[in-house]
Design a protein with these regions (language model features):
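Intrinsic disorder/low-complexity segments
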Residues: 161-162
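Anionic-ligand binding patches
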Residues: 1-151
Length: 162
């Protein structure tokens, strides 16, 4: 919050480093710590956000049309599913697991960084997991089940979600 929403949607390219992900993660984390400088802890609030969108054609089911997060664009009907993980940015990296900003992100109500969470524990609270679980629950009301639904909340590359 102290950075007015930065790095935002540009989080993977925050430091402008290209190449392997390990190098860019380290550069992004260094820049985040640098930019926050002496910002006090109470102003280091942050969040991970995922928004998934399910689109249907003009003949969308009534469950889509009546959903509180229904929208229409170019004749298509959609529903957005939001997942948010609130937390704080630490002053130094902590932990070896995860990826990206995980070593700097402390979840509300915990002293550990996300890089100290096990995969199952992290997926249970992650912004991606929350959004995918909401999507899966909605699809179940339509009588549909996505392929790979037993693995929603983790990605297909075998690493943890953030």
């Amino acid at each position: 919050d102290a950075l007015d929403g930065a790095p935002g949607v540009h989080s993977a390219r925050f430091a402008g480093v290209t190449g392997d992900s390990t190098t860019s993660y380290a550069a992004n984390n260094r820049l985040l710590i640098e930019r926050l400088g002496d910002v006090p802890g109470e102003r280091r609030s942050a969040r991970f956000v995922t928004e998934l969108v399910l689109l249907y054609g003009p003949e969308a089911p009534s469950a889509i049309m009546s959903h509180p997060r229904h929208f229409e664009v170019d004749g298509l009907h959609g529903v957005a599913f939001l997942g948010v993980l609130e937390g704080w940015i630490r002053t130094e990296a902590l932990g070896e697991k995860g990826f990206g900003y995980d070593p700097l992100f402390r979840v509300d109500g915990d002293t550990r960084s996300l890089a100290q969470y096990g995969m199952d524990e992290k997926n249970a609270i992650s912004h991606r997991g929350k959004a995918f679980r909401a999507l899966r629950a909605f699809l179940a009301t339509l009588g549909e089940q996505p392929r790979g639904s037993d693995d929603l909340g983790s990605n297909n590359r075998g690493r943890q979600t953030s």
